[in-house]
Amino acid sequence: SRAAFRGGCQGVSAINTIRSIMSVNLDTLRPEPTVEGFTTPGGYSGKAVRPIALRMVMEIATMIRSEFPGRSLSGLGGIESGEDAAQFLLLGADTVQVCTGVMKFGYESVKRMCDELLAFMEKHKFETLEDFKGKSLDYFTTHRELVRMQGERKAKEKAAAAEKAAAAEAPKKMVAADSEWSGDEFVKQSDALARG
């Protein structure tokens, strides 16, 4: 994508099908599916590629933000519902494309997907796609940073628990002189004195 943008491209799409081999028949020892006993790597598509497509869209959208503002990204790869489309948009896609989903469910599925996307938008009170495009990008970081944040949280929890335990074990201040008796606190002070 970077090379395409450097070359003057105004937009890219991600991802197409992933070249794949479905299997090898262990009886015939031939790859499958076969045509006249032979095969060729084909395109792996549908919802199985969605996690890969989402990662690629996130990475490209992040690059566009920092290096090529104003360029566009169309997300595709496993979109079968409006919720799927929303995920691509949240990760920075400007538009989405559907192929395998329509092949599986028919052209009428496009209206369903649009209705589902609109329901998502209404739920979150988004009026336009721009209101949420790329909104999830700010929540990505490095593995190192995740470990640091988790360690920091655990250290704070441990310190708070130790402070609470120390407060629970600390001796209660006893009344040492008549002048320390309080009218409002007399019952509590008496109980504390009796318990030792």
List each language-model region with its residue ranges:
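C-terminal helical cap(s) of enzyme catalytic domains, especially alpha/beta-barrels
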Residues: 21-41, 103-126
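Alpha/beta enzyme core
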Residues: 1-74, 80-95, 142-172, 179-186
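Short beta->alpha connector loops at strand-helix junctions that form conserved
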Residues: 99-100
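Short histidine
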Residues: 105-196
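Short, surface-exposed acidic/glycine-rich loop or hinge patches that mediate macromolecular interfaces
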Residues: 78-79, 103
